[in-house]
Amino acid sequence: MTNIRKTHPLMKIMNSSFIDLPAPSNISSWWNFGSLLGACLAIQIITGLFLAMHYTADTATAFSSVTHICRDVNQGWIIRYLHANGASMFFLCLFLHVGRGMYYGSFTLSETWNIGIILLFTVMATAFMGYVLPWGQMSFWGATVITNLLSAIPYIGTDLVEWIWGGFSVDKATLTRFFAFHFILPFIISALVLVHLLFLHETGSNNPLGTPSESDKIPFHPYYTIKDLLGLMFLLLTLTILVLFSPDLLGDPDNYMPANPLSTPPHIKPEWYFLFAYAILRSIPNKLGGVLALIMSILILAIIPILQTAKQRSMIFRPLSQIMFWILTADLFTLTWIGGQPVEHPFVTIGQVASILYFSLILIIMPTVSLMENKMLKW
C-alpha cells in the first residue's frame, strides 16, 4: 500500500517540500536560517494575534492599552516581549541568511534571490509600522521622521506624505491604518515565503562548495529536520533568555513615555536593525540624496548577481573575496553603531566614510577582486 503522504493531494505537497525533498548532502548550519525565519514568522503571527485582541488603535488609548497588556492580561507581558524581541531575532536571522547567500553565491538563483529582496523590504515595512503602534515618544517621532522622507519626492512628495498620514500630521488616522497594515502584512509575507520556496525547489538548493549537487543528494527528513530542530532550540533559548532576563535590552527608554507632539526626544533613532540604513541616510546632507541612498542600501542586493565576475560560485576557495566580505561585515557593524550616535563630530565623518565604503565594496571593490582571482587562477 502506498503511503498516504505520497498520495493525498495536500500531504503530497508537504512531502515533496519537507520530507522526501532531495537535498545536497553537504549543506552546513548556515542553511538553517530559512527554517529559523519560518519559526520567527510563526512566533510573530501567534503573539501578534494575541496582542491584537487587547490593543486599541487609537491615539488616546494605544499607550495605555499596551500598559494594560503588560500589567493586567494573563501572561500579557511575556507575549508583548516575545513579540518585540522576536522581531529582533527575525532580523538577526534575516541578515545572517542574506550574508550566507552572498558568501556562498546563492544569489545566482535569481528568482529566489529577488523574491527574498521583496521579502526583506516587506518585513522592514511591517517592523517599522509595528514600532509605531505602542504610541510612545520614539514611536511617534520615528513615524514622523521616516514618513516625512517621502516629501523629498519631487512634485508629489508633500501630497503623498499627507495621504499616508490621513491628515496634516501623524495622528489617529495614521495609527489606525498602520495597525491595519501591520496586521495584514505578515500574511502577505507568508504568501511570499511560499513563492520563495517554490522557486528554490525549482532549482534545488546551493551548497557550501557552490558545485552542482545532482550526483549526491539525501532526503530532507530525517537528516535536515533534526539539524533544523537543533538550530530552532538555540533560537528559542536565545529568545527566552532575552525575554526573561533583559526584555528591554534592545528597546529605547524614550518609548516608555507617551507620545507628545510638543516635545522632541534628544536623539531620534529607529530600532537596532534599521540603524545601518539610518546611518547611510544621515550621512548625505541632501534630503532626496539621503532617501535614494537609504533605498539603494537594500536595493543594491538586486544587482549583486549582475556584478558577479568570479568564475567560482562560492567564496570558500577565494581568500581575497573573503577578506572583502568580512570588511563589508565590519563596515555594517560600524554603520549600525554610528546610526545610534548623535549627529555630531566625529560620528558624521565616520558615517560618511562607512557609507562610501559600503557602496564601493559592493559596486567596485568586490567585482574587481573577483577578476583578480580569476587571473591568479588563470581562468
UniProtKB/Swiss-Prot annotation:
Gene3D superfamilies listed in its UniProt record = Cytochrome Bc1 Complex, Chain C
GO CC annotation: mitochondrial inner membrane; respiratory chain complex III
Q: Which GO terms describe its biological process?
A: mitochondrial electron transport, ubiquinol to cytochrome c
Query: Does Electron transport appear among the keywords?
Result: yes
Which residues are listed for heme b b566 binding in this entry? H97, H196
> What SUPFAM superfamilies does the record tag this protein with?
a domain/subunit of cytochrome bc1 complex (Ubiquinol-cytochrome c reductase), Transmembrane di-heme cytochromes
Q: Name one GO molecular function term.
A: ubiquinol-cytochrome-c reductase activity
Q: How is the cofactor bound?
A: Binds 2 heme b groups non-covalently.
Annotated localization:
Mitochondrion inner membrane
Its membrane topology, per UniProt? Multi-pass membrane protein
Q: Which InterPro entries match?
A: Cyt_b/b6_C (IPR005798), Cyt_b/b6_C_sf (IPR036150), Cyt_b/b6_N (IPR005797), Cytb/b6-like_sf (IPR027387), Cytochrome_b (IPR030689), Cytochrome_b_C_euk/bac (IPR048260), Cytochrome_b_N_euk/bac (IPR048259), Di-haem_cyt_TM (IPR016174)
Binding residues annotated for heme b b562, in chain numbering: H83, H182
Name the residues that bind a ubiquinone. H201
Question: Where is the chain membrane-spanning?
Answer: 33-53, 77-98, 113-133, 178-198, 226-246, 288-308, 320-340, 347-367
Cofactor(s) this protein cannot do without: heme b
Q: Does the keyword Translocase apply?
A: no
Q: What are the record keywords, sorted? A: Electron transport, Heme, Iron, Membrane, Metal-binding, Mitochondrion, Mitochondrion inner membrane, Respiratory chain, Transmembrane, Transmembrane helix, Transport, Ubiquinone
What family is reported? Belongs to the cytochrome b family.
Q: How does it assemble?
A: The cytochrome bc1 complex contains 11 subunits: 3 respiratory subunits (MT-CYB, CYC1 and UQCRFS1), 2 core proteins (UQCRC1 and UQCRC2) and 6 low-molecular weight proteins (UQCRH/QCR6, UQCRB/QCR7, UQCRQ/QCR8, UQCR10/QCR9, UQCR11/QCR10 and a cleavage product of UQCRFS1). This cytochrome bc1 complex then forms a dimer.
Q: What job does this protein perform?
A: Component of the ubiquinol-cytochrome c reductase complex (complex III or cytochrome b-c1 complex) that is part of the mitochondrial respiratory chain. The b-c1 complex mediates electron transfer from ubiquinol to cytochrome c. Contributes to the generation of a proton gradient across the mitochondrial membrane that is then used for ATP synthesis.
What further note is attached to this protein's record? Heme 1 (or BL or b562) is low-potential and absorbs at about 562 nm, and heme 2 (or BH or b566) is high-potential and absorbs at about 566 nm.
Report the protein name in the record.
Cytochrome b
Q: Which organism is it from?
A: Microcebus lehilahytsara (Goodman's mouse lemur)
